[in-house]
């Protein structure tokens, strides 16, 4: 039923919200992308309060439709321009300084969210399906 105005709605926000990408809950942090601005937001999932500074994803030059994914202490954000930014997942309110570990580019366009399986990273581009592994 309708839970608007009930105790079931713990918190809500109406700014800094994503346009297409779904949020990511990783460890004790909720990540989401600010509406069409390539800015990553970190939040406390229980209170809805921001954690630290917002992070502009400088390496991505187009919109981000894919949802961020996380594994092994890293957060992966893929833009439509084929760029994936790899970030260190900071704990708690630790600063996002020096968070960018790598910026990788493929010559394709990505709207679908990546999939992580075991030690493989799958990306579906407009032209190809990619499997990245060590």
What is each PLM-predicted segment?
Residues 1-134:
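Noncatalytic, solvent-exposed loop/strand surfaces
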């Amino acid at each position: 039923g309708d839970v608007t105005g009930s105790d079931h709605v713990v918190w809500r926000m109406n700014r800094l919200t994503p346009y297409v990408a779904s949020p990511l809950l990783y460890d004790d942090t909720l990540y989401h992308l600010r509406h069409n601005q390539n800015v990553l937001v970190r939040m406390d999932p229980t209170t809805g309060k921001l954690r630290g500074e917002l992070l502009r994803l400088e390496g991505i030059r187009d919109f981000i439709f894919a949802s961020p994914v996380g594994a092994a202490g890293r957060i992966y954000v893929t833009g439509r321009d084929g760029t994936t930014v790899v970030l260190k997942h900071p704990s708690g309110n630790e600063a996002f300084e020096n968070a960018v570990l790598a910026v990788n580019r493929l010559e394709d366009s990505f709207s679908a969210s990546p999939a992580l399986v075991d030690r493989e990273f799958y990306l579906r581009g407009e032209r190809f399906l990619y499997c990245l592994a060590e």
